[in-house]
A protein has these predicted regions:
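RNA substrate-binding interface of SAM-dependent RNA methyltransferases
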Residues: 1-56
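Hydrophobic alpha-helical segments that mediate membrane insertion or helix-helix packing
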Residues: 4-5, 72, 112, 116
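Structured adenosyl-cofactor binding patch, chiefly the S-adenosyl-L-methionine
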Residues: 13-24, 82-124
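Generic hydrophobic alpha-helical scaffold/packing signal
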Residues: 32, 37-40, 44, 57, ...
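Active-site-adjacent beta-strand anchor residues
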Residues: 33, 74, 110
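Active-site/ligand-binding-proximal alpha/beta "capping" segment
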Residues: 51-105
Length: 124
């Protein structure tokens, strides 16, 4: 990961709880606060794939993934906005391992990010 892009509604990456949770890793990447719709449009025009994480996306373990691009992680409570969803080229999901209908609907965004990044790295 070289860059993290945040919108105005994102939790402050330098919030003490965020810094502690990252174990200092936040200081090894470049962080930008930006207008995400503008950024995503620019990156798509440059040919970079934009992946989004959704409850109704394609299974991350069986979907073709790129070795480059941008991954959008949604807010834990609200998910990804409709505006940002329209700019994602591929919708991904982490499948539930529950064998019954009482599965978890969503994961903590930090846990979900770790799982998603791990799968991209595994495929490199």
């Amino acid at each position: 990961i070289g860059n993290i892009f945040c919108d105005a509604d994102c939790a402050g990456v330098y919030n003490p709880k965020c810094v502690q949770a990252s174990m200092g890793a936040i200081f090894r990447v470049k962080t930008f606060y930006t207008d995400l719709p503008v950024l995503l449009n620019e990156l798509k025009q440059e040919g970079l794939p934009v992946f989004g994480t959704f409850l109704d996306g394609k299974n991350i373990y069986t979907t073709a993934l790129s070795t480059r691009g941008l991954i959008v992680m949604g807010n834990e409570g609200k998910g990804i906005s409709a505006e940002i969803e329209a700019l994602t080229g591929q919708k991904l999901t982490i499948p539930s391992f529950a064998r019954n209908s009482e599965s978890t609907e969503s994961l903590n965004v930090g846990v979900a990010t770790g799982i998603i990044l791990s799968e991209f790295k595994r495929r490199m």
